[in-house]
Curated annotation (Swiss-Prot):
It is an enzyme of class 3 (hydrolase). The keyword DNA damage does not apply. The lineage of its organism: Archaea, Thermoproteota, Thermoprotei, Sulfolobales, Sulfolobaceae. This is [LysW]-lysine/[LysW]-ornithine hydrolase. Binds 2 Zn(2+) or Co(2+) ions per subunit. Pfam families: M20_dimer, Peptidase_M20. The keyword Iron does not apply. The active site is at D70, E122 (proton acceptor). The gene is lysK. GO terms for biological process: arginine biosynthetic process via ornithine; L-arginine biosynthetic process; lysine biosynthetic process via aminoadipic acid. Its EC number is 3.5.1.130, 3.5.1.132. Zn(2+) 1 binds at H68, D92, E146. CDD domains: M20_ArgE_LysK.
Length: 346
C-alpha cells in the first residue's frame, strides 16, 4: 500500500509540474497538445482531440472523469517545496485533472474502462463541455473534477445568465445637457441590482459599463453587462423580465446561459464518492456552490453525476494556488474506489 502511494505521488509530481509549466488560459488549450500525446503513449490511453474546442479525451468507456485544462489568466512559475506544488491551475483544475488521469491509468490497467477529459474553456463559456454534449456521448456516470477540499461532494450549482444591454440617447454639450445617459442608466442599475446574499436568493450584478467618447459631450451610447445567478428554485423568466421592464428603452441580448443543476443524494455517483471517502476515514460533506461548473452542462448526457476533487477551493483564481501530493493521492484513491464500485454495479 505504501509503495503504491509513493508511486502515485511521484507520478503526480512529475505530471503536475509538467502541466503547470504549460500556460493554458481559456482559448489556448492547444498549448497542452504534446503533453496529452505523451500521456496517451505512456499510459496506453487512446487520445481524441475535439476539433471545435480543442478539448482532450483519453481512454474509452461509459464512465467519464471530466476536468478542465484551461485556467484563468496569469502565469505563475511552478515550483515544489516539501511536497507542496505551486502554480497557476494547481488547484483549479490541473491538480484534480492529474488525479483523474492517474486514476484512469490505474483503473484501465485493472481492466476497468474509464474515459478522462481535459475540457477546454471551463473558465469562460464551457465550449468544451458543450461540444462533448453534441458528440453523441452518453455516459452511465460522470465525476466532474473541481477542487472541493478533498472532502466535499458538490450536488448543486446555481445557473447563470449573461446579459448585454445597449442603450442610446441624444448627445449634448455637457455644460448645458438636460439629460445624461450615464446618470439615467445608473439609477436603473441601482434599482435592479440584487447583491449576492445567500444561495437561494438570485443575484443581479453589473460587471461592465462603457459609455462616452469626449470629455465635454454626454454619451450617445452605453454598454452594460449583467451577470445573473440563480438557484434551481428561482424562476429564470421572472429575472429576465424584471431587467427587461427596467430597461425598456434599451436593447437586451442573452450572450450566454447555463442552467442550474441539482442531483439527488441517492445519485449513484454521490453514493459511491461518499463510500469512497468513508473507506479512507474521511468524513464527506454534501455541498452546493454559488457559481457554475461543467457539471451544469454535462448533466445533459448522464443521469448520474456529481463533482469532487482535491485542492482547497478558497485558493481558486488566486496567486497562491497550491496543492499537496497527499491531496492528489487522496483524490486518486477516491476516484478509483468510487469507480470500482460503480463498475461492479454496472
Amino acid at each position: 500500500m505504501q509503495q503504491e502511494k509513493e508511486l502515485v505521488k511521484q507520478k503526480a509530481k512529475e505530471l503536475l509540474l509538467d502541466l503547470l509549466s504549460i500556460y493554458t488560459p481559456s482559448k489556448n488549450e492547444t498549448n497542452a497538445t504534446k503533453f496529452f500525446e505523451k500521456i496517451s503513449n505512456e499510459f496506453n490511453l487512446k487520445l481524441e482531440i475535439l476539433p471545435d474546442s480543442n478539448s482532450f479525451i483519453l481512454g474509452e468507456g461509459e464512465i467519464l472523469l471530466a476536468s478542465h485544462v484551461d485556467t484563468v489568466p496569469g502565469y505563475i512559475e511552478p515550483k515544489i517545496e516539501n511536497e507542496v506544488i505551486y502554480g497557476r491551475g494547481a488547484v483549479d483544475a490541473k491538480g484534480p485533472l492529474i488525479s483523474m488521469i492517474i486514476a484512469a491509468w490505474l483503473l484501465n490497467e485493472k481492466g476497468i474502462k474509464v474515459m478522462v477529459s481535459g475540457l477546454a474553456d471551463e473558465e469562460s463559456t464551457s465550449i468544451g463541455a458543450k461540444e462533448l454534449t453534441l458528440k453523441n456521448f452518453n455516459f452511465k456516470h460522470i465525476i466532474v473534477g473541481e477542487p472541493s477540499n478533498g472532502t466535499d461532494i458538490v450536488v448543486e450549482y446555481r445557473g447563470s445568465i449573461q446579459l448585454d444591454i445597449m442603450c442610446e440617447s441624444t448627445p449634448e454639450h455637457s455644460s448645458s445637457a438636460k439629460s445624461n445617459l450615464i446618470v439615467d442608466i445608473s439609477k436603473k442599475i441601482i434599482e435592479v441590482y440584487k447583491q449576492p446574499e445567500n444561495y437561494d436568493k438570485p443575484s443581479i450584478v453589473p460587471t461592465i459599463i462603457r459609455a462616452g467618447e469626449s470629455y465635454n459631450v454626454t454619451p450617445a451610447k452605453l454598454y452594460l453587462h449583467f451577470d445573473v445567478r440563480y438557484a434551481i428554485n428561482n424562476k429564470r423568466d421572472d429575472l429576465i423580465n424584471e431587467i427587461k421592464d427596467k430597461f425598456q428603452e434599451c436593447g437586451l441580448k442573452i450572450v450566454d446561459e447555463t442552467q442550474p443543476v441539482k442531483v439527488s443524494i441517492n445519485n449513484p455517483v454521490v453514493k459511491s464518492l461518499t463510500r469512497a471517502l468513508l473507506k479512507q476515514n474521511i468524513k464527506p460533506r454534501l455541498v452546493r456552490k454559488a457559481g457554475t461548473s461543467d457539471m451544469n452542462i454535462l448533466q445533459k448526457i448522464t443521469t448520474s453525476i456529481a463533482t469532487y476533487g482535491p485542492g482547497n477551493s478558497m485558493l481558486e483564481h488566486t496567486n497562491q494556488e497550491k496543492i499537496t501530493l497527499d491531496e492528489i493521492y487522496i483524490g486518486v484513491k477516491t476516484y478509483m474506489l468510487a469507480i470500482e464500485e460503480l463498475w461492479q454495479k454496472s
